[in-house]
């Protein structure tokens, strides 16, 4: 599945989201997926080929690169976007299932008085209530967990969010401690900080939406007659 397909699927979820959820999807598309596809790949490029060490020992450069960059930044961000987007796909599946059930009941004649035809069922805005509320709320909760987990993994794996210009490596088969140089470290640091900052904004939006849904749920409960 490419990014265009993912955008199409999540665009369908956007119709059933809250206003805060729509802002989150906009940030996800413009500031994360578009930046990752258009700009970040150009900055990183073939990063292993641009990783230079002051030794001719066969295998030393590859081992040092693998030690300092066990997973490419691009691939880690792509994996993060997949994990963060997956809960939203569950909401889309739930909405599709609910519409399928309404179509089935309409064909059987159980709810013919509620809809004119099947097309009206397809275009009906689905309200976030009942079991869909739990699915939607759970999806937001897991998005926050995935975002925070990947930010932590990123920080631990790369020892911070800034890209070092020079790294020293003494892993085998290097004959001694060698100096290795990272290409375009400043540009990569800027992109890294930007992506982390956008992840933080997404977490803030998700937490805000979660609080909004919980408050609306509690106020709806309190209005019900005892």
From Swiss-Prot:
The keyword Membrane applies. Changing residue 34 to A: Loss of gap junction ion conductance, probably due to very low open probability of the channels. Can form functional channels with wild-type, but with strongly reduced channel conductance. Changing residue 113 to R: In DFNB1A; uncertain significance. The gene is GJB2. It is a multi-pass membrane protein. Changing residue 50 to N: In KIDAD and HID syndrome. It comes from Homo sapiens (Human). Ca(2+) binds at residues 42, 45, 47. It is linked to Deafness, autosomal recessive, 1A: A form of non-syndromic sensorineural hearing loss. Sensorineural deafness results from damage to the neural receptors of the inner ear, the nerve pathways to the brain, or the area of the brain that receives sound information. It is found in: Cell membrane; Cell junction, Gap junction. One of its GO terms (cellular component) is gap junction. This is Gap junction beta-2 protein. GO terms for biological process: cell-cell signaling; gap junction assembly; gap junction-mediated intercellular transport; sensory perception of sound; transmembrane transport. The chain crosses the membrane at residues 21-40, 74-94, 136-156, 190-210. Residues 2-13 dip into the membrane without crossing it.
């Amino acid at each position: 599945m490419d990014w265009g397909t993912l955008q199409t699927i999540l665009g369908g979820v956007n119709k059933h989201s809250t206003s805060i959820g729509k802002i989150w999807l906009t940030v996800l598309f413009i500031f994360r997926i578009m930046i990752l596809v258009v700009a970040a790949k150009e900055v990183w490029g073939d990063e292993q080929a641009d990783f230079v060490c002051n030794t001719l020992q066969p295998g030393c450069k590859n081992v040092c690169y693998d030690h300092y960059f066990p997973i490419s930044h691009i691939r880690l961000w792509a994996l993060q976007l997949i994990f963060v987007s997956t809960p939203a796909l569950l909401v889309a599946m739930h909405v599709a299932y609910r519409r399928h059930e309404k179509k089935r009941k309409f064909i059987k004649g159980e709810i013919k008085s509620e809809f004119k035809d099947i097309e009206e069922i397809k275009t009906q805005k689905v309200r976030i209530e009942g079991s869909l509320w739990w699915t939607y709320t759970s999806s937001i909760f897991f998005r926050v967990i995935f975002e925070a987990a990947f930010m932590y993994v990123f920080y631990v794996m790369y020892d911070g969010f800034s890209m070092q210009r020079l790294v020293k490596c003494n892993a085998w088969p290097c004959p001694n401690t060698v100096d290795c140089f990272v290409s375009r470290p400043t540009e990569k640091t800027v992109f890294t900080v930007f992506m982390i900052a956008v992840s933080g904004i997404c977490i803030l939006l998700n937490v805000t939406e979660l609080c909004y849904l919980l408050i609306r749920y509690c106020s709806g409960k309190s209005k019900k007659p005892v």
